[in-house]
Structure formats: structure tokens, C-alpha cells
Amino acid sequence: MDTLLHGFVTATARLGLDYRFLLDDYERVPFVQGLGVSIEIIVSTMTASAVAGLLLLLALRGRNRLVCGLARGFIEVTRNTPTLVQLYCAFLVLNMLITQWLHARGIDNPFKPFFWVVLVLSLHKAAFHAEALRAGFDALPSQTLEGAASLGFSRATRFWRIELPLALRAALPALVNNMVELVKASAVASAIAVGDVNYQSIMIWTQRDNVLALMLLILAFFGVLTWLVTLAGSWLERRYRIPGYGY
């Protein structure tokens, strides 16, 4: 491994790129940990945003007008404000208020920056997931819905066994695009000092002034991740496509 690293550092040095930090455990280990943190953020937010998006969809399609209105308002606010601003509001305002309230009672705040990144990104993308699913439901043929109702299925059974599976398949392209955007949006974690790959890279280049070399690594890292998500999404679209829908 050391031989490969030395060879890589030497070869890239001829191109004017400084990757000597890879030979220093003090800098290499945090960088590798940052890669892991970024992946952990992405996996966590993908899972949480999918669950939250489904809950928002249920609220939108529910019979309670108040709940539906609140869900619609949340979606509109979330979709129309920047992710970074939402993260700052959550971490610098809401987190501060929680900290003050807990400290007044002699309790430490258990919510770390990682939690706020996952929460904000998950809720942000959940709004887009819910809209994609809503469009999927709107695209369902009326004959299918009428046929399910005529068979005597309950409303819940129709939703979980017929409508949702078909809507998911119709909404897959939009949902996959949301996941790709989520991978890229995870880069905002460094804004509140979460030790992801961006944050660790900043710590390194402030000492070594090798911004270009590290930026190329970051671009390659996120490029590979988005490619993998796109690849998986394309497979799912082919596997579960609805005949006649054209994708």
C-alpha cells in the first residue's frame, strides 16, 4: 500500500499536483475518515428522506384538511428556500434555543452537527420526494383505480397494494434524480464543521496550499458516488418500468 501511495504521489507531482499529505498519517487518516463521514451522511439522508417523503405524501393524500395544509405549507417553504440557509437556521437558531433550554435544566445538548445535517437534508429532499410521488399518483390510470374500488378493496388496501407500488414505478426517474441531488447537497455539511471530506480537505489545504489537488479528489469522489446512484437508478427504472410509459 505504501509503495502504491509513493508511486501515486510521485507521478502526480510531475503534473504539479501535491498529494504528499497521503504519506502523512496525521493528515491521511482524517481525510479517509472524512470520506467515511460523507458516505454515512449520504446513506442516512437517503433512508430518512425516503421515509419522510412517504409520510408527507400520506399527509397530502389524507382526509384531514389541517394536516394536508400543514404538509403543503412545509413542502412549499422547503422547496423554495436554499438548503444552506435551512441548515444555518436549524443549527445556529433552533439548536441554540434547544441548548439554552437544556442547559437551564442542567442537561447537555445531545444533538451534534451531524444530526442537524442529516435532519435538514432529509426534510429538504423529503419535500421533493413527496411531490414526485404525488405526480406518480396523478399519473395512475383512472380505470385502474376504479377497478380496484369495484373489487371491494378498502382504501388502505388500495393505497398500499395497488396505488403506491404503481406510483413508485411511475415516479422512479424523479426520485432517482432527487437522490443524485442529495449526494451533491451533502457537501454543505462542512458549513457547520461536520468532519466530512470537504471539511477535512479544507484543514489540509490551509496547511499545504494544495487546493487544486484536493479539489480534484473531491470532484472525483462525488462524481463516482453520483455515477453509482445513477447506475442503480437506471437499473431500477428498467427493472420496474411500466409498459407503455416510455422509459
Model-based region annotation:
Residues 1-247:
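Transmembrane alpha-helices and adjacent helix-loop boundaries
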